[in-house]
From Swiss-Prot:
Its EC number is 2.7.7.48. Keywords: Nucleotide-binding, Nucleotidyltransferase, RNA-directed RNA polymerase, Transferase, Viral RNA replication. This is RNA-directed RNA polymerase catalytic subunit. GO terms for biological process: viral RNA genome replication. Residues 313-512 form the RdRp catalytic domain. Belongs to the influenza viruses polymerase PB1 family. The keyword Signal does not apply. It catalyses: RNA(n) + a ribonucleoside 5'-triphosphate = RNA(n+1) + diphosphate. The keyword Amino-acid biosynthesis does not apply. GO terms for molecular function: nucleotide binding; RNA binding; RNA-directed RNA polymerase activity. InterPro entries: RNA-dir_pol_NSvirus, RNA_pol_PB1_influenza.
């Protein structure tokens, strides 16, 4: 008999069995294996830095993902046609259960969504109404948060704020709007579609001939420059086509910070219009996941709360004679999700006729508006187009150029590139976008897809079986029970068939079954009542990236907090301090150099200067410089060194600053000083000020003006730090009204202004009301 894997053996052995019974089940095994738990593997994990940044053209990986979404559509001609579809009907024949499939069964999905609605209609209605009220009061500038966003007007990937500015400039020009709430922004998009004509500016690449002197010889050379081009659309059909083109455009990147994978994956970034729709969808589902009734969703929570839910949800299982726990892996998650299925789910939730048919109370009035917004979101998603981006670098002996994704350039492509390009070119349009009606792209609708999968848990449950699951997007863990072995098998097959009918494919190779209370979910490993987070993704030891002294201090203060909360013991604290300090040194390339400063004891050198760490588990709540000063206050050379480091007049030291924040204890705004006094090693970030073109200079000038305007606005109206205003009034007018009211209030309590002061106030009001062009929200 072959020996079984020891890890498998430890999962098969039950408590309460004799040694002989266990050996009959699994064969001979080492004595100690009975008590082996997850703690035995924790030391195998190494805390390392993330892999390097992804470089190269994203087009091959983007094409791979899009082609897979077509390939897994098992309808005739892969569901392509005038109206591409992913839903499977009875007339299409037997549903393909046995292969990876991107189709969802229409009638089965309807029944599952109805059963989910019957159980959760009250919480769905509560969250719908709360979300609608939030849309009316939330400022649309939430879209400025984020590193990269696709700017579809200029076909470039830029910081989110820059892409938002381009879209809002067009909206303001034609709709004369000043400020936007989220709801205003969505309405403005629809009003743009109705315009009879439109003129807008876009940036295009052009060639400019320049004179260049080299070695006394003047030559004419062509140089690539970016220039503004004015586009004039004179018909509503052209306006609609252009605006819809903007709203469906994506770009793709190669995913950096990837876990232990050899091959890179493509991720996508939407345009600001579609990002707004996706934000609304995600926020609703994140809020839904926070509700107590949604016991299976953990997408909205983290930390101790999430850990408790991972343990508590399986505990709600009705135990039977036969019980089992599955650690699941969904294969081809993004490629197989269908925008139509998302739309169907929300349509059923908010449909008056379906509610009436099921005998449920009517949805709130706001549900009709939410229903229309969600219909539009998934319509745009089903018409998405992904920009392939720059091509590979090609060169000969003297020149280099970038490949273009055109049929004419096939002669320059190697076999591997040619293979995928010939498959994708039928979906490629003249602007360089690939049409991708099926599936999702990585990073989209994580919370929405979590909710989409939940109806499968209870549908078609029979007496004598039970099922509980915890899910966060494509990661899930499920417990099953059955009164008989046959019922347990039927329960497992029922659940995975239900998921299959929703277009979710559970991998047979990667899904593992264990005894109850043993499994892995979102890198949290469960072993009985103990759940712990292991893995290279554990972020507690990663430097913050502010500057060396603050990052070192952060390592120590986080360790002190962990000790106080009981998260780590003193041994764990020592490890955490050592690894954390070492990681910060590595990030800033700080070498540990004993005897670096002549005459200064090595132990007095600060960490940022290559000195040793002063911390251990008993003193990590104290700042580094205070510890080193107390230790060396009798040594004049050490104290002189520390005084130089701490000298506030040092030209390289950032000025001390105060931060205005809201105190929950005092229920008011408070001024708080920075936790650590600034010193010589508090480096300042120097931003790249290179002006490559006049357009870049204009962008930078606009950014400086915005920062100055916001600084003035926050000084005049400190409450704006607490709540971002979302009204349609110009900032300048609001500031003028507040200044006038403040001056009037002060005079009413006996404060007298001199003539010079009154002149200054009148000048400020005149500037704000007449000379100001601060008209953004």
């Amino acid at each position: 008999m072959e020996r079984l894997n020891s890890f498998l053996v430890s999962t098969l052995i039950r408590d309460g069995m004799s040694r002989e019974e266990k050996e009959k089940l699994v064969g001979p095994y080492p004595v100690g294996i009975e008590n082996t738990g997850l703690g035995a593997v924790s030391f195998l994990y190494k805390y390392v830095n993330v892999p390097p940044l992804a470089v190269g053209a994203p087009a091959p990986k983007t094409a791979e993902s899009v082609l897979r979404s077509f390939e897994y559509n098992r309808l005739p001609d892969n569901g392509k046609g005038l109206r591409p579809r992913q839903y499977w009907m009875e007339t299409d024949g037997p549903y393909p259960y046995d292969v990876t499939c991107a189709n969802f069964h229409l009638s089965a999905a309807q029944e599952m969504h109805k059963s989910f609605l019957r159980e959760h209609h009250a919480v769905i209605d509560k969250v719908t109404e709360a979300m609608y009220q939030r849309l009316k009061t939330t400022n649309a500038d939430i879209l400025t948060k984020g590193k990269q966003t696709w700017d579809p007007i200029n076909k470039r990937s830029v910081p989110s704020a820059a892409a938002f500015k381009e879209i809002t400039t067009v909206l303001r020009t034609y709709l004369k709007l000043v400020g936007f709430s989220v709801l205003d922004f969505v309405e403005a998009f629809h009003r743009m579609l109705m315009l009879p004509e439109m003129v807008y500016n876009r940036r295009v690449n052009a060639e400019k001939t320049v004179r260049k002197r080299k070695g006394g010889v003047i030559t004419l050379e062509k140089k690539a420059v970016v220039v503004l081009e004015t586009v004039h659309l004179t018909r509503n059909e052209d306006v609609r086509e252009t605006v819809m083109g903007w709203a469906t455009a994506f770009c793709s990147y190669l995913k950096s910070k990837e876990r232990g994978k050899l091959k890179r994956r493509a991720i996508a970034s939407a345009n600001p219009i579609l990002r707004m729709f996706l934000w609304i969808v995600e926020e609703l589902h994140l809020e839904l996941g926070k509700q107590e009734e949604m016991v299976s969703s953990t997408i909205s929570i983290g930390g101790e709360e999430k850990r408790a839910k991972i343990i508590a949800t399986p505990d709600g299982l009705s135990l039977n004679e036969f019980n089992i726990q599955a650690t699941e892996d969904a294969t081809k998650w993004n490629e197989c999700l269908a925008p139509e299925n998302f739309c169907l789910m929300h349509e059923i939730w908010w449909s008056h006729s379906i509610r009436e048919e099921m005998g449920l109370p009517k949805p709130p009035e706001s549900a009709e508006i939410m229903r229309q917004i969600f219909q539009q979101a998934f319509y745009l998603l089903s018409h998405k187009r992904i920009y392939l981006g720059k091509g590979h670098l090609i060169h000969n002996q003297t020149r280099a150029a970038l490949l273009q994704w055109k049929e004419d350039h096939e002669k320059y492509m190697n076999e591997k590139t040619l293979e995928w390009f010939r498959k994708i070119k039928e979906h490629l349009d003249s602007e360089g976008y690939v049409k991708a009606p099926f599936g999702m792209l990585m990073g989209m609708l994580n919370a929405g897809s979590t909710t989409l999968a939940l109806p499968a848990t209870k549908w078609r449950l029979q007496p004598g079986m039970d099922c509980k699951t915890v899910r966060s997007s494509d990661d899930s863990m499920t417990v099953f029970s059955g009164k008989t072995r046959q019922l347990l098998m039927e329960n497992i097959n029922r659940f995975y068939d239900n998921l299959k009918l929703l277009g979710i494919n559970i991998s047979q190779k990667k899904t593992r079954f264990f005894q109850l209370k043993f499994g892995e979910y979102t890198s949290a490993y469960q072993d009985g009542d103990f759940t712990a987070q292991y893995g290279v993704g554990t972020a507690a030891l990663r430097p913050e990236g502010s500057n060396p002294p603050d990052d070192f201090h952060s390592v120590a203060s986080q360790t002190a907090t962990s000790l106080r909360s009981g998260t780590v013991n003193f041994v764990g604290a020592q490890f955490r301090l050592g690894i954390g300090v070492d990681n910060v040194r590595r990030l800033y390339k700080i070498d540990r150099t004993p005897g670096k400063r002549q005459g200064v004891p090595d132990s007095a050198l600060v960490l940022s200067d290559g000195g040793p760490s002063p911390w251990n588990f008993s003193n990590c709540h104290l700042p580094e410089l205070a510890l080193k000063w107390i230790t060396h206050e009798q040594n004049p050379q050490a104290t002189r060194y520390l005084e130089r480091v701490m000298n506030p007049n040092n030209p390289f030291t950032a000025d001390a600053a105060e931060i205005t924040s809201f105190s929950r204890e005092l229920n008011t705004l408070v001024e708080t000083s920075l936790e650590l006094p600034r010193n010589l090693f508090h480096t300042l970030k120097r931003f790249n000020a290179t002006q490559k073109s006049l357009l870049r200079k204009g962008d930078n000038d606009f950014m400086k003006s915005c920062n100055l305007a916001m600084q003035l606005f926050e000084e005049v109206i400190p409450a704006s730090l607490l709540q971002v205003p979302s009204g349609p009034q110009p900032m300048s007018q609001v500031m003028a009204d507040v200044l006038r009211a403040q001056a009037s209030a002060l005079r009413s309590v006996g404060v007298h202004f001199t003539e010079e002061e009154m002149e200054e106030i009148r000048g400020a009001l005149n500037t704000l009301e007449h000379d100001s062009n601060i008209d953004f929200e």
